[in-house]
Amino acid sequence: ITTCWSDWSRSVEDAFDALSQHMDAVFVGGLSAGAVLSLRHAQRYPGRARGLALYSTTLRYDGWTIPKLSFLLPLILKTPYFGKRYRFEEAFPYGIMDDKLRGRILAQMQSGDAAAAGFTATPGASLKQLWGLVAAVKRDLPSIKTPTLIVHAGNDDIASARSNALYVRDHIGGPTELLLLDRSYHMVTIDQERNVVGDATARFAWNLLSDAERERLAAVAREPVPAAPETSAQTPDAAAPSPASSVAEGMEKAAEGAGR
């Protein structure tokens, strides 16, 4: 591994700065270690993010698929031999409860298509960097005042809700919303309740916008985009909604549903 956790954190900062140049409100969120990086950004830059969305926050690997002796791993990785050679291999069900989806994702992972599905194994050096990030975040978790959405599977196979989601809820300094899922494992953003996760995220973000921002977002949802140029393979009949329009419309509908 050629990067450390401060490099990971810096990449979040760079992406945030780039978005901030074009957006009125920026939310920061991530899955697993990405959730921990989101917390770190909120620590370093208080008040910049409008809200945090934490999916399957992983402060500790203690789900039901993790070996009971895994607490010895930090000591093992300090040895020169294992420190360079150890790789954490994911086990069935690979964070996914949906059988069909799991089969497709696993095939991509095993084919080496990391861009599409990630890896089946994590190098020990990466784990050591993650633990350093977690330690930094936990030391100053109460300093975070940013409104936070916490989404976690109640039966997470990788990181238990008790040691992770509930820990964040009980120690963070700002207001929180907690969503525990019944039909998902660790990969909550793609598993069986992904639509529930999407609706909760849209509703959370909508509630943190000002009236003026909501009006602008609703206006975007009503704006069509020009149809794509005609090709031999496709002849559009009418303008299609842009991705931004679809997101805006989804947020508006989610908020309306919450108000009923």
For each predicted feature, which ranges?
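Alpha/beta-hydrolase-fold enzymes
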Residues: 33, 37, 44-123
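Catalytic nucleophile-loop/oxyanion-hole region of alpha/beta-hydrolase
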Residues: 1-27
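Conserved alpha/beta-hydrolase "nucleophile elbow" surrounding the catalytic nucleophile
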Residues: 30-32, 153
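Catalytic active-site module of serine/aspartate enzymes centered on a nucleophile-bearing elbow/loop
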Residues: 182-237, 241-260
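Conserved alpha/beta-hydrolase "acid-adjacent" motif
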Residues: 157-164
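Active-site nucleophile elbow and catalytic-triad environment of alpha/beta-hydrolase enzymes
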Residues: 123-140
